[in-house]
Design a protein with these regions (language model features):
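Solvent-exposed loop and edge beta-strand segments that line ligand/cofactor-binding
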Residues: 351-366, 409-419, 504-520, 589-612, ...
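Short strand-turn-strand beta-turns centered on an Asx-Gly dipeptide
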Residues: 800-807
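Aromatic-rich carbohydrate-recognition surfaces in CAZymes
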Residues: 361, 365-366, 370-381, 385-479, ...
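Active-site acid/base region of carbohydrate-active enzymes
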Residues: 320-334, 383, 388-397, 423, ...
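Short, basic, low-complexity termini and linkers enriched in Ser/Thr/Gly/Pro
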Residues: 274-290, 534-561
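Catalytic cores of carbohydrate-active enzymes
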Residues: 149-151, 399-401, 522-537, 550-652, ...
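Anionic coordination/interaction segments
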Residues: 1-364, 379, 384-387, 391, ...
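Inter-helical turn/loop segments and adjacent helix faces that build the functional surface
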Residues: 137-144, 270-273, 434-449, 527-538, ...
């Protein structure tokens, strides 16, 4: 069943009925001001940090679902009937409805009682505000006497405190109203230098800022007393719950339209200029008033929206393909690339499954997100790399998470997730291959953001490698610490306290026994990439006469020797006969072995081992892939492990706390599926790689939306596995490493167009029934027009560049 369709020309997904299985959302903003918006105008906004700078309030797990957002109410003043153009919150049946989610914008259009409403929501580039551009049209043959009410609910800034500390928060809310603009200034009188504002372009018949006066006692958003009676209370919030609502009266002739613009924004003042007059408690509005005046002008709004569309045309134009498969084209050309931008901005902080109050930006998560984003805005990728490295510990370890507003490590979670450091070298290598910016290696970066501790980024990478080498267990494999990539495989926690967080629970074991085969294969991959980087750096130095070594980087022999030694250890202690083991627990017993009663085979080490080159020369790579296909593959994707854990195992931790088939306990954890796709491509299995790609491809699953339930235009983190009655149902959409890794799998390994130090590599491994494809790739400022034609049954490439044969499969960089 479909709830909409892809509008490929406009790069939009068009939702045609409001009651989708779950809220189908979009993101507004791409720089500092962000918003989440659902197909019925639910969601919230924040500045930089979804916890510490939450602008509007949102209640997760609410009943009814997705109540609270950017709401408009239309009222027919002649009859008293009112409705929501976005369907929610009144849920009045509409005569027509569409929601168009586009690149950084959403358009909701509907009609009821021959009155149509169309609202465009977006965040202008370079502005810390969002625009609601609303057009109301009278389609009747008589005059329409209407009232339009806007509504947002302000959050008291810290979203966690806002949702928990009522004894204080019911007493602190403050607003100002001036020239029809509602200013939210809670705590501005003391510690804060920022405020929010809500403005309207039309003359007002009234306003409200106090929730209870707007709604009425014991009423909800679906039936506000102010809208019901058609008159605002002109309330001013003094404590309790502050809101923003404008009342605009409209008299429309037959066929007449009226455009009203609403602005919701964030503003900071210099601390010594907070008040005007200085000795008052009145917000200094000298800086914000010109901004409000500018963006309330229709011509400014139209120009800003055109700029946003052009911005995304440029971003998406960096990589465009035309393949025989429509779902692939949609994901590569538009939706997967778009999701990579969103995950770069959000990491795992704010979605409809992540409340924005806990995780901030993850070290591992953000390092992987860079892999699918680095070609889009390299300058921002560079900045993120340096921010990540600055949270690294002096011993090479890393904070698991850091807050985007402060860029400091999260002490509550801390470090000890022992795979974290190894993702940084992979991110840096991807960045340098894309940009050729070797100078980043010489950038001075502190540890734990402590001034005076700076070393070149190259040394941070070396310390990341050494962190693994300095933390090996009894078999010579890396110690797992608190966890590795699978945060729920907690081999040292032994938690038996109800409600205790596995991520912050104290270690019950000393951590000197439990080892991770996954970290071992990841280490081999990272060490080999560091060796190749070292060789390239030394080559550049040797080719530049009299050049002083600009940064310190170990010789490639160091990394190759470390990788070779780890490979020997893996074959001795990490191979189970037909697949790679997952780990050794705190008692030295195998995890992910045929000897185990449950959890005999895990997906994670299989694909990454092949990416690291293990087993390619002796058939064991193909044997591991065959085991994955036989034991883990389902019609909806590849499950994380089998058999699922049927009960809680104290020594395994959170992974066994989930019911079978959900999350880390044998769901289709989509993040890991592209590792297998890449592995299949590396061994030359184009059909199998693409088959796995299509199984979890959102656009290919659009026809089973009643089963999949999440958005058909973006990846979800997890799909219920075959051990669960809800097999095929997705959860945790949008913010997942699945986005970056699937983008890498399809664009760089199946289509085979990937950056290298020396040029653009063309090495497709496509399905046998494809006769070829075309692509456009902008790489280091040069536009490459690529035509791939199948001339046989293999994957060997004969490269022709500008009409001339070129040896190998790398298009050399222009002279």
């Amino acid at each position: 069943m479909r709830y909409g369709y892809f509008d490929d020309k406009n790069r939009e997904y068009v939702i045609t009925q409001p009651d989708t299985p779950l809220p189908w959302i979009n993101y507004l903003g791409s720089e500092a001001y962000f918003g989440l918006i659902s197909n019925t105008a639910g969601g919230y906004s924040f500045y930089r940090d979804a916890r510490l700078r939450r602008i509007t309030r949102y209640r997760y797990n609410n009943v009814p679902l997705d109540f609270g957002g950017r709401y408009l109410y239309l009222r027919d003043n002649a009859t008293g009937a009112f409705w929501s153009p976005s369907w929610q919150p009144t849920r009045t049946p509409l005569d027509s409805y569409t929601c168009r989610h586009g690149m950084g914008y959403t358009i909701i259009e509907s009609a009821n009682q021959q009155i149509s409403a169309k609202t465009l929501y977006f965040v202008p580039l370079g502005a810390n505000l969002e625009i609601w551009s609303t057009t109301i049209t009278n389609q009747r043959d008589t005059v329409a006497d209407l009232s339009l009410f806007s509504l947002i609910e302000f959050c008291l800034w810290d979203a966690w405190d806002d949702a928990t500390n009522y004894q204080r928060n019911f007493n602190i809310a403050q607003v100002e109203i001036e020239d029809g603009v509602i200013y939210h200034k809670t705590e501005y009188r003391e510690r804060r230098d920022h405020f929010a504002y809500f403005a309207c372009s039309a003359p007002l018949a009234g306003y409200d800022t106090h929730r209870e006066d707007f709604l009425g006692p014991y009423r909800g958003w679906d039936k506000p007393v102010v809208v019901e009676r058609g008159e605002s209370a002109n309330s001013e919030a003094r404590s309790w719950a502050p809101i923003g609502s404008h009342h605009v009266k409209l008299t429309l002739q037959p066929g007449e339209s009226r455009r009203i613009i609403f602005l919701l924004g964030y503003q900071e003042n210099p601390r010594d200029q907070k008040f005007d007059p200085p000795d008052s408690q009145i917000i200094n509005k000298r800086l914000v008033k010109p901004i409000i005046a500018k963006y309330l002008q229709p011509e400014t709004v139209d120009a800003a929206f055109a700029d946003l569309r052009a911005y995304w045309d440029g971003i998406l134009g960096i990589y465009q393909v035309d393949t025989p498969d429509m779902a692939t084209n949609r994901m590569v050309n538009v939706w997967n690339a778009y999701q990579c931008m969103v995950t770069f901005n959000m990491s795992r902080s704010a979605s409809y499954f992540e409340s924005g109050v806990g995780r901030g930006l993850g070290f591992r998560d953000s390092s992987q997100d860079l892999l699918g984003f680095v070609h889009q805005v390299p300058a921002r990728a560079r900045e993120r790399i340096l921010d990540l490295a600055a949270t690294q510990l002096a011993n090479g370890g890393a904070y698991h998470q850091f807050q985007p507003l402060t860029k400091r490590g999260n002490d509550a979670v801390g470090s000890g997730f022992n795979d974290d450091p190894l993702w940084l070298p992979l991110a840096v290598v991807a960045y340098i291959k894309e940009t050729g910016d070797f100078d980043i290696l010489n950038a001075p970066v502190p540890y734990e953001n402590k001034p005076g501790t700076e070393t070149p980024l190259a040394e941070h990478l070396e310390r990341a490698i050494n962190y693994t080498l300095n933390n090996l267990g009894p078999h010579g494999l890396p110690l797992i610490g608190r966890a590795d990539w699978n945060d729920c495989l907690n081999l040292n926690i032994f938690s038996d306290e109800p409600g205790e967080s596995f991520q912050v629970a104290p270690l019950k074991k000393d951590g000197k026994v439990a080892e991770s085969v996954f970290i071992a294969v990841l280490f081999v991959l990272a060490a080999k990439e560091m060796a190749a980087l070292s060789d390239k750096v030394n080559q550049r130095i040797s080719e530049s006469a009299n050049q002083v070594l600009p940064f310190a980087i170990r010789h490639s022999h160091f990394y190759l020797d470390a990788a070779a030694k780890m490979e020997q250890t893996i074959w001795a202690h990490g191979w189970d006969g037909a697949w790679f083991l997952r780990a050794y627990d705190a008692f030295g017993e195998k995890v992910g072995s045929h000897e185990c009663a449950e959890g005999q085979i895990f997906i994670e080490p299989q694909g990454v081992a092949i990416m690291a080159g293990l087993g390619l020369d002796d058939g064991r790579a193909e044997l591991a892939l065959a085991s994955v296909k036989e034991r883990l593959a389902t019609e909806h994707g590849i499950v994380l492990q089998q058999p699922a854990y049927s009960r809680y195992y104290l020594h395994l931790g959170e992974i066994s706390s989930y019911p079978p088939g959900f999350k880390e306990n044998a769901s289709i954890f989509c993040h890991t599926n592209p590792w297998i796709m890449i592995g299949e491509a590396i061994v030359g299995h184009g059909d199998q790689a693409f088959d796995y790609y299509k199984r979890i491809c959102p656009a290919a699953r659009e026809g089973i939306s009643e089963i999949h339930r999440c958005e058909p235009y973006v990846y979800a983190q997890t799909i219920a596995g075959r051990d669960n009655p809800r097999h095929g149902e997705a959860k945790n959409s949008w913010l997942t490493g699945t986005a970056a890794w699937n983008y890498v799998a399809i664009t760089q390994w199946i289509l085979g167009i990937r950056p290298s130090y020396d040029g653009l590599q063309i090495a497709p491994v496509i399905p046998m029934d494809w006769q070829g494809f075309t692509a456009t790739r902008i790489f280091r400022g040069v536009t490459y027009h690529i035509t791939v034609e199948r001339q046989g049954g293999g994957n060997t490439v004969s490269l022709v560049v500008d009409g001339k044969p070129v040896e190998g499969n790398i298009v050399p960089l222009p002279a």
